[in-house]
């Protein structure tokens, strides 16, 4: 079954993912090549956000990834909380998750939402950035998938060496 699923995903990556608003969600092939084995739930990012976020923006990418994986915010009391279409700019997502009752923290976990304070880690000062944690490595570094980092509307991947005071996390659950 894994081979069948992998073949289906490979085909989708090559063809792109149709969106109702006309956008195409694709994983950047060059960026994907080195991280394929480290992706959360062994699935390649793609699909629609189901929330009407602006296609290609970082907020759209995280909403689409959560939608694809069937993830919800993990509530502080274990409940499952849906993200909303007004989570704010990228730098606001973790604070909004907290205000909705979501569990947040400063430690990366696979499947978490990660917000970057504006003007840090290569983000715009006004909006910040949001990404999805695909994997946490033994040394504390973590792999993120993201859209609109550096203006690229496709999913790209980068490894963050460690969490710092400009990074916060909202935790998710299935």
Label the predicted regions.
Residues 1-13:
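Alpha-helical oligomerization segments with coiled-coil/rod-like character
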Residues 8-9, 38, 51, 153, ...:
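Intrinsically disordered, low-complexity segments enriched in small/polar residues
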Residues 17-130, 135-137, 145-146:
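Secreted/periplasmic proteins that engage bacterial cell-wall peptidoglycan
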């Amino acid at each position: 079954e894994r081979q069948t699923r992998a073949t289906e995903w490979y085909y989708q990556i090559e063809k792109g993912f149709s969106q109702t608003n006309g956008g195409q969600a694709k994983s950047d092939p060059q960026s994907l090549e080195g991280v394929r084995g480290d992706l959360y739930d062994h699935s390649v990012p793609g699909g629609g956000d189901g929330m009407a976020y602006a296609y290609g923006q970082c907020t759209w990418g995280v909403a689409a990834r959560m939608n694809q994986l069937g993830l919800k915010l993990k509530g502080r009391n274990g409940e499952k909380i849906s993200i909303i279409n007004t989570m704010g700019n990228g730098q606001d997502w973790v604070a909004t998750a907290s205000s909705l009752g979501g569990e947040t923290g400063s430690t990366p976990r696979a499947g978490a939402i990660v917000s970057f304070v504006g003007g840090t880690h290569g983000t715009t000062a006004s909006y910040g950035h949001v990404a999805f944690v695909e994997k946490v490595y033994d040394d504390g570094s973590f792999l993120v998938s993201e859209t609109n980092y550096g203006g690229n509307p496709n999913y790209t991947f980068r490894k963050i060496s460690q969490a710092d005071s400009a990074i916060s996390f909202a935790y998710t659950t299935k």
